[in-house]
């Protein structure tokens, strides 16, 4: 069984910032994440949505370019490319969180964490213990 000072369940903005600060204070820290580092907002909600909105905004600007004295021929959208860009933005930011975990020597445990008696967490059949467990699941 691996022993930590702090285990953080969830790697969204609350979880990963908490883990970074704990590690900076000298505590042996782990983050348990069931999906992608960064949480729902970064990977599926806020960030990719804003990337999609930006693409729509740029397309709208192109449609009205003549209002600004500019001529744009054949402005067209490619929905697959728009979605690919949105995913790329989110993936880049998730990789940024991954970099911060590594830089701050935080163990990232992939899987679904289940709280157990005695300050323990089970992740897919493997048990971890900590002096403190922080629930940051959103």
How would you name each of these model-derived features?
Residues 2-3, 20-27, 32-138:
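Glycine-rich flavin
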Residues 1-12:
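Beta1/beta-strand and adjacent pyrophosphate-binding region of the FAD-binding site
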Residues 15-16:
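N-terminal Rossmann-fold NAD(P) dinucleotide-binding loop
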């Amino acid at each position: 069984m691996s022993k930590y000072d702090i285990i953080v369940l969830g790697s969204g903005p609350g979880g990963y910032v908490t883990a970074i600060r704990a590690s900076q204070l000298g505590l042996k820290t782990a983050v348990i994440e069931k999906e992608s580092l960064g949480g729902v907002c970064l990977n599926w909600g806020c960030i990719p949505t804003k990337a999609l909105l930006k693409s729509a905004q740029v397309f709208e600007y192109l449609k009205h370019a003549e209002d600004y004295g500019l001529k744009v021929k054949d402005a067209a959208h490619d929905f697959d490319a728009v979605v690919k860009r949105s995913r790329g933005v989110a993936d880049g930011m998730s990789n940024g969180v991954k970099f911060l975990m590594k830089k701050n020597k935080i163990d990232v445990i992939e899987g679904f964490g289940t709280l157990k008696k005695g300050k323990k967490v089970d992740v897919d059949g493997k048990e971890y213990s900590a002096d403190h467990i922080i629930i940051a699941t959103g």
